[in-house]
Regions:
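Residues in soluble alpha-helical coiled-coils and helical-bundle/repeat scaffolds
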Residues: 6, 19, 23, 60-63
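Short amphipathic alpha-helical interaction patches enriched in hydrophobic/aromatic residues
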Residues: 28-31, 36, 55, 59
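Low-complexity, acidic interaction segments enriched in glycine
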Residues: 46-126
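N-terminal leader/signal peptides at the extreme start of proteins
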Residues: 1-7
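Aliphatic-rich helix starts adjacent to a transmembrane/signal segment
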Residues: 31-48
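Alpha-helical hydrophobic helix detector
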Residues: 15-31
């Protein structure tokens, strides 16, 4: 009687492969989350630049600041208010009112997110 050799992997081989995969994951996962955070910060910076440019265009066209954030949408300076990538909502933007009594309205806009960016500055101060 000939004994047939079973096909498959031994327990040692499986453990070695699992150890290699575990090592690769410990390297890759932190980098993935850092890249995700960097992407969210980039989106936030771009959204703020677009909104601030829309506020400036509104002021240049009408010599007044928009009274509320929705005025930028109503007057078609932006199609819609972007979703804050950190709060995941479009209504959490905080506005800075104009200090000039002759030109009241939204002078600047910031994120409503808590926490700090990768550079250590508060997201709400961007």
């Amino acid at each position: 009687m000939r004994r047939r050799r079973e096909k498959g992997f031994t327990l040692i081989e499986l453990l070695i492969v699992m150890a290699i995969i575990g090592t690769l994951l410990t390297i890759a996962v932190p980098r993935y989350f850092r890249a995700l955070e960097h992407a969210r910060e980039t989106v936030l910076r771009q959204d703020l630049a677009i909104l601030r440019e829309a506020i400036d265009k509104h002021y240049a066209d009408l010599t007044e600041y928009p009274d509320v954030r929705a005025a930028l949408v109503d007057k078609r300076y932006v199609r819609s208010l972007p979703v804050d990538p950190f709060t995941k909502a479009a209504d959490t933007w905080t506005v800075v009112a104009s200090e000039d009594p002759d030109h009241v309205g939204v002078r600047d806009i910031h994120s409503g997110a808590e926490g700090n960016g990768a550079d250590g500055t508060a997201l709400a101060s961007w």
